[in-house]
C-alpha cells in the first residue's frame, strides 16, 4: 500500500527510508513499528499540543514532535501540517496527495466506503508519523505490548478525529477496524466521515431566522447519512420560509400541464417511433385541455416546434416526468416522494392529471403543500444532487441506490416550486415566460 501511494505523489527519492519506517523489526532485541495518522489540523504544533494534553505520563515536546513512555513502550509522534513551513509542509502535502491518489485508483466493491474515505482524506491537513518500540521478552509479553501500543494509538487517534495506516497495508479508524486494504477489502459495513464540529455560518452573531435554515440543513445531512451518503455541513443553506417565494397553485398546475405535454411528446418520439408531426398531433388534445401553451418555457416551445429534434434533446425532455412527479407531489396527488433509486412511475404520473377534464377542474381539486414541506424536500434534494455531482466530478464512486438524473431533475422541480434562487429579474407571481422555469438555478 505504502509503495502504491508513493507512486501517486511527488516523492523526493527517500522511498527506502519510508519503507523502513513501516517495517516491523521482529527479530531484533527491540521490537519497532510505525504507522501514519491523517488528521484535520493543518499545523504540526497543533497536533503536538493536542497529543501532549492527552498524555498523563511525563513527555518531551519540541515543535511538532512528542515523545513519551507508557508501560515499557516508547512512543514518538512527529506531526507535519500543510500550513507548516519548509520541508514539513512539503512532506504533509505529498503524503496527503499520495494517499488520495492511491485511493482513487484502488479497485474495490465497497464504493460507498471508498468515496467516504476519500472525503475523509480531503478534510485532513496533517500527517503524523507514529513510531513505537519496546524491549523484547517473550512472545506473550510482546503481544501484550503490541496490543497496548495499538490501543494507545487508537485512543489518541479518536481525539484527533483522524484515520491511520494499519500495518502499512490498510487504512483504519480509531476503533482499529480496517476501512480498506490494498486489495479493496473492508471490515466495516458502513463508513462515513465525521461531521464537522462547526459549520461556517454558525456563531453567536447568527440571525434568528437563519436558525430555521441551519436546522433544515442539519436534518437533511442526517437523513442522507442514514442512507450512507455524506454531504458536508459547510454547504450553503437554502432560503427560509420568510425568504422563499413559493409558486402559486395556479402556476404549479400549469407547470404540471406543460411537463406532461413535453414528456408525452418525448415518449412518442422515443418509445413509439412517431415523427415530430405525429407526436405533436398526439399531445395536442392534452395541451389544449390543460392550456399548456400558456405555461411552456422558451426551451419547451423550441423543442415542440423543432421539426427534427436530436436524440440527446429527446432524452433530456423525457426526464421531465421526474419534474411532473414533483409537481403532483407538491399538489398532494402523491402522499410522498419515493427515494430516487429508480425513475418515477411514468404511467401513474400521466394518469393523475388526465383524470381531470380541464385546468380549472385540476386546480380546484388539489391542495398545495405548505412552504415548509417544499423547502424540506428542496434542501434534501439539493444536498443529494451535490453528492452525485461532486462524486462524478472527482471520479469517485457514485452514491449507491441513487439515480443521479432523477435526483437532479427533482431538485430542479423542488427549487422552482418552493421559490428557491428565483430567476434574475423575476418578481413575485412570475413575470418571465414559463414563470422562469428555464432560469432555475441548479448551481451547487
Residue ranges and their predicted role:
Residues 224, 272-301, 366-389, 443:
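An acidic intrinsically disordered interaction segment
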Residues 1-87:
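Charged, amphipathic alpha-helical stretches
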Residues 9, 13, 42, 46, ...:
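Alpha-helix boundary/N-cap detector
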Residues 69-74, 80-281, 301-305, 309:
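Extended, non-transmembrane interaction/recognition domains
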Residues 368-444:
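Alpha-helical oligomerization segments
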